[in-house]
Amino acid sequence: MARMLAVRVVAGLAAAAVAALLLEHYGLAGPTTPLPKPRGSQRPHPAPGSEANNIFWGLQISDIHLSRFQDPGRALALEKFCSETIDIIQPALVLATGDLTDAKTKEHLGSRQHEVEWQTYQRILKKTRVMEKTKWLDIKGNHDAYNIPSLESIANYYRKYSAVRKDGAFHHIHSTPFGNYSFISVDATQRPGPKRPYNFFGILDEKQMEELVEFSKKSSQSNQTIWFGHFTTSTIMSPSPGIRTVMGSATAYLCGHLHTLGGLMPVLHTRHFTGTLELEVGDWKDNRRYRIFAFDHDLFSFADVTFDKWPVVLITNPKSLLYSCAKHEPLERLFHSTHIRVLAFSLSPITSVTVKIDGGDIGQASHLSGPIFILKWNPRNYSNGTHTIEVFVQDSAGRSRTAHHIFSAQEDAHLTFDPLASFILLTDHYIVARVLFVLIVLIQLTTLITFRYLAYPELKEPLGFANMTTFSLHILSKINISYYSVLLLTLYTVLGPWFVGEIIDGKLGCCFSFGIFVDGHFLQGGLTFINGIIQLVFFNIPLMAYVCWSLLHRCFGHSFRSHLHQGKYWKIIPVYLLILLLYIWQVYSCYFLHVTYGSLAFTFSPLRTWLTLLTPVLIYRVWTLNSTELGIFMVQLKSHLSS
């Protein structure tokens, strides 16, 4: 009866957890306001040709991380970018997509807003007069929102020192003689903004989503629309229908945040199911990367380049096949174009622009106007299959650069993005983290409860690894001190609170696996679930395994000292090395908590500080259990070994 009850409880918890996750992700919303549909086929003309019209270009820079403690070269390079680079490229607008400042403490673990970093940022903008040369659109990143109790707080230096100085999303329209182009910002920074690390994920609420839907509707009158934000869509938590659906009519979403995963993924680009491109740009902080993009006859092109590397080259026609989408762009204009078109910029005058297709030299492009170079061609000559265009640019100082990509003059041709990049950008990682967290907890609880109510084992087969593991789980689950300790630890990891402290300076809050309560606000969990998984996998479960292992040794009649002198050091030493490393990690997590959230959080942290202190107590208690408590298991082992 008890066994059936336990099974029903676990099954009910599993079903409830899965249902809750699905409902939260997909919602039970009724009919929603229709979103603008992607642009359909447009007129084939005007097509890219021999005139210097229907084209403009801009720049994107992200993750600048101006710091009062780290790498002053970031500020020096940014100043040069705002003067020299802007003067040469002369963009119509610049998108600065977040993390303008670093906002970390000297030891690089804690976080707070440093006014001097923001003053440095503003000084650069004013000194270079960059806002007089171009439209500088800067938005906040998660670092710019560290430790900010409210948007009205004096610590919200973005309002005082940025170029835009307006919190929240906005819709900028770039007007040209040949049409309007919409640039819609997404501000998913958390409100209020907790200290690091728990604001890694962005959050959009219902009101913010409604505002973005309105922007999307208004942008339907524009030639093309670009969305830009700090967070990748995979790190934004948003209610139904989801941020990707809302921006579904856009040509591209330009973002930063992931720093190309520390260089492991130098190209993080993909395409949404709506056809919208998602393009993460490399960080300025360590890699000095930026992006040049252009609309040439409403065809979108871009190139990610390294600061101070000249020439900068962008082929605008024919555009790259990988980044083409008939849903959003008039690709038929490419098929009716009369000229190959290239943008080339350098410190010195451009002297030659050589064009090759499929390895064959087809000629020298001639200078049209400004940075625009053109070369007559016939796209019908390349109407079959895919082809590679290569452009070699050289300036008068001998600097050179080659740009190349695959293109096609067929409407039905397409290429696929890197599957790993698509997984990183298209997966809602907070949903995956929640599901994994729940599954790990359910597996651990099911194992504990099942073995608790199973009949005592009978050892009939040889003592192999599987038999010993099963036997040790029986011991763990049927000895009260070990069973309730592990059960309580698992349940507490789920229910919390993990700690109570100053989530924001002067604002008390509680951190749970499912989110953070601070100053009357609830911030839903994203990174908290990931930390919960790490806690389970790298401490709770190994501790449970070690307790099982220790209890098994006790049943063989060993004490803590005697089991160390069995002579089987090759079996024992790896166990203790692993446990020691994991315990050191737990101790470090206490130190990290103290540095990031202060002494109060360190003191009132059951899952960190208290657990670190209680773990040796549990281990001592296990190794000093009376033989009477282990009696039936010791008898079974002796009986089996003597038979």
Curated annotation (Swiss-Prot):
<feature type="transmembrane region" description="Helical">
    <location>
        <begin position="572"/>
        <end position="592"/>
    </location>
</feature>
<keyword id="KW-0812">Transmembrane</keyword>
<keyword id="KW-0472">Membrane</keyword>
<dbReference type="InterPro" id="IPR041871">
    <property type="entry name" value="MPP_TMEM62"/>
</dbReference>
<feature type="transmembrane region" description="Helical">
    <location>
        <begin position="431"/>
        <end position="451"/>
    </location>
</feature>
<dbReference type="InterPro" id="IPR056229">
    <property type="entry name" value="Ig_TMM62"/>
</dbReference>
<dbReference type="InterPro" id="IPR056230">
    <property type="entry name" value="TMEM62_C"/>
</dbReference>
<feature type="glycosylation site" description="N-linked (GlcNAc...) asparagine">
    <location>
        <position position="180"/>
    </location>
</feature>
<dbReference type="Pfam" id="PF24384">
    <property type="entry name" value="Ig_TMM62"/>
</dbReference>
<keyword id="KW-0325">Glycoprotein</keyword>
<dbReference type="GO" id="GO:0016787">
    <property type="term" value="F:hydrolase activity"/>
</dbReference>
<protein>
    <recommendedName>
        <fullName>Transmembrane protein 62</fullName>
    </recommendedName>
</protein>
<feature type="transmembrane region" description="Helical">
    <location>
        <begin position="9"/>
        <end position="29"/>
    </location>
</feature>
<dbReference type="Pfam" id="PF00149">
    <property type="entry name" value="Metallophos"/>
</dbReference>
<feature type="transmembrane region" description="Helical">
    <location>
        <begin position="532"/>
        <end position="552"/>
    </location>
</feature>
<dbReference type="GO" id="GO:0016020">
    <property type="term" value="C:membrane"/>
</dbReference>
<dbReference type="InterPro" id="IPR029052">
    <property type="entry name" value="Metallo-depent_PP-like"/>
</dbReference>
<keyword id="KW-1133">Transmembrane helix</keyword>
<dbReference type="InterPro" id="IPR004843">
    <property type="entry name" value="Calcineurin-like_PHP_ApaH"/>
</dbReference>
<dbReference type="Pfam" id="PF24394">
    <property type="entry name" value="TMEM62_C"/>
</dbReference>
<feature type="transmembrane region" description="Helical">
    <location>
        <begin position="484"/>
        <end position="504"/>
    </location>
</feature>
